[in-house]
Amino acid sequence: MTIRRIAATLACTLAFAAPIMAAAPALVALDSAVYVERIVPNKGRLLQPASALKRGDRVVYVVSWTRMGGQGSFTVTNPLPKKVYYQGSADGREEVSLDGGRSWGRLDALRVGDRLATPEDVTHVRWRVPANEAGRGSGQIIYSAIVR
């Protein structure tokens, strides 16, 4: 093989390898905390660690993420416990699933049979963290649910 052919082969190999390296999956560490929202006279709403829950309690989930490596965007998916129904997230960019994570969409655009989906139908919730936000290195996703 000539030097020119070796150089051309190496250049082609690097050209194809570069996008693969750039598209390496994001390495993300997640940490979750669960709080219950309490209304306290003269203090308003307080979040307390959720040690005991009862029907009707508003639960606030805080998912903290830290970028450990990789590039690009990533997705955070959380299944909802059967004992709660979804209320919404702080940023409104979430997608929900009604079928255990097989299909996704905005709650206001999904249907169950011939009716619009309701928060009680949600089984999973996910957020797509775009590359520009992921590049900051860390962040939080906050959403709430009501205990059934």
Question: Where are the model-predicted features located?
Answer:
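Exported/extracytosolic protein signature
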Residues: 2-3, 7, 22-148
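Bacterial N-terminal signal peptides
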Residues: 9-19
